[in-house]
């Protein structure tokens, strides 16, 4: 069986933490920021993590991460 290919679009968007979780950036932070509160924008700067239900799917997309 040939090697599995990593989906490059996903590889650029996710990093693996030391414990093996997938770290991601949060959405809704690129434009239309004037109507969002200071608190909301501050929370969007923090990292998000892939949910456990999605991790199995992501492991197929990113086999070598």
UniProtKB/Swiss-Prot annotation:
Which superkingdom is the protein from? Bacteria
- What name is this protein filed under? Large ribosomal subunit protein bL35
> What GO biological process term is on the record, naming one?
translation
> Mind listing the GO molecular function terms for this protein?
structural constituent of ribosome
Please give the organism.
Clostridium botulinum (strain Hall / ATCC 3502 / NCTC 13319 / Type A)
Xref: Pfam families:
Ribosomal_L35p
Q: Which UniProt keywords apply?
A: Ribonucleoprotein, Ribosomal protein
GO terms under cellular component = cytosolic large ribosomal subunit
- Family classification: Belongs to the bacterial ribosomal protein bL35 family.
């Amino acid at each position: 069986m040939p090697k599995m290919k990593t989906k490059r679009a996903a590889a650029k968007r996710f990093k693996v933490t030391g414990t093996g979780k997938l770290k991601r950036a949060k959405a809704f932070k690129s434009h239309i920021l004037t109507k969002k509160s200071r608190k909301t924008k501050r929370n969007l700067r923090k990292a998000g993590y892939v949910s456990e239900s999605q991790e199995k799917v992501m492991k197929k997309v990113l086999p070598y991460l």
